[in-house]
């Protein structure tokens, strides 16, 4: 009866994937998986070597708040609206050895991690994963790299990048407070970074980046340099030493649930050949 109830609610595919992989990774949405992978690769974290295209992830973000018939069918198919605990417990009734990890957004609410039991849920201390790499300097460098540096409009384009970015920082981060914005701009690099992190800890920086790319496209013409869902491409432009230690801690958690990949000689990768 438990098997029938679980399969009816979550769908057989959820059970099959959990049985094959031995774990479930709970994230807000598909872009989180892309960002975690990009961060792992940028940091050279060991978990990057275990990554494959069959990540068993479950998206907990409820994209369908209105419970019409279509939304309800979508919820049952994809699991939207079900908490990680409900989903994991339903599957673990069938798979007692199942491991679970949730890496979820804080959303500015000081959510507390849960580390006891087979399902561990950790929250980003900042608003979301994007808050660990999106900065004005990064957006400026990325945008500049996407336009010709040696044509007649190069200086005009750079001016547009700076002005769009400054206007956005002033309004979205400093709430229009010109004096505070000026202090941030004139601060040393270290002080500027600390102030940026403090001011944006509870702000959704993915939205900030999307607004920047939209504003820039309107200003200089042409298409968006990056669309929603492509922000993980920015990670390649981040100096590894600038990525907070917390990111590595989250990746360490991920390494604990990912299965060890076997080399062609049958030796676990990263463990060496037994003596």
Predicted stretch roles:
Residues 97-203:
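Activity-critical C-terminal alpha-helical subdomain
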Residues 1-17, 244-275:
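Switch/communication elements of ASCE P-loop NTPase nucleotide-binding domains
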Residues 40-44, 87-92, 216, 235-238, ...:
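Hydrophobic, Leu/Ile/Phe/Ala-enriched alpha-helical segments that form helix-helix packing faces
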Residues 1-101, 106-110:
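RecA-like P-loop NTPase motor core
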Residues 2-6, 14, 35, 86, ...:
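Exposed alpha-helical structural elements
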Residues 191-245:
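C-terminal structured domain segments
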Residues 170, 174, 222-226, 240, ...:
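Intrinsically disordered or highly flexible coil/loop and linker segments, enriched in small
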């Amino acid at each position: 009866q438990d098997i029938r109830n679980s399969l009816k609610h979550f769908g057989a595919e959820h059970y099959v994937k959990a049985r094959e992989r031995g774990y479930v990774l709970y994230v807000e949405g598909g872009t989180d998986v892309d960002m975690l992978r990009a961060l792992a690769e940028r940091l050279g974290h060991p978990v990057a070597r275990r990554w494959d295209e069959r990540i068993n992830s479950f998206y907990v973000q409820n994209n369908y708040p209105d419970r019409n018939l279509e939304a309800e069918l979508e919820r049952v198919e994809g699991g939207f609206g079900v908490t990680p605990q409900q989903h994991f417990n339903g599957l673990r009734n069938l798979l007692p050895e199942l491991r679970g990890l949730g890496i979820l957004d804080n959303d500015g609410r000081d959510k507390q991690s849960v580390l006891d039991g087979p399902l561990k849920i950790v929250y980003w201390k900042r608003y979301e994963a994007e808050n660990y790499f999106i900065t004005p300097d990064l957006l400026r460098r990325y945008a500049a790299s996407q336009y010709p540096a040696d044509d007649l409009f190069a200086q005009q384009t750079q001016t547009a990048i700076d002005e769009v970015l400054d206007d956005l920082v002033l309004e979205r981060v400093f709430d229009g407070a010109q004096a505070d914005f000026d202090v941030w701009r004139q601060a040393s690099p270290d002080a500027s970074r600390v102030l940026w992190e403090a001011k944006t800890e509870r702000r959704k920086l993915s939205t900030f980046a999307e607004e920047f790319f939209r504003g820039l496209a309107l200003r200089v013409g042409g298409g968006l340099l990056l669309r929603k869902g492509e922000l993980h491409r920015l990670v390649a432009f981040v100096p590894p030493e600038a990525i907070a230690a917390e990111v590595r801690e989250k990746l360490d958690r991920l390494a604990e649930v990912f299965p060890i990949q076997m080399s062609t000689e049958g030796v676990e990768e990263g463990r060496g050949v037994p003596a």
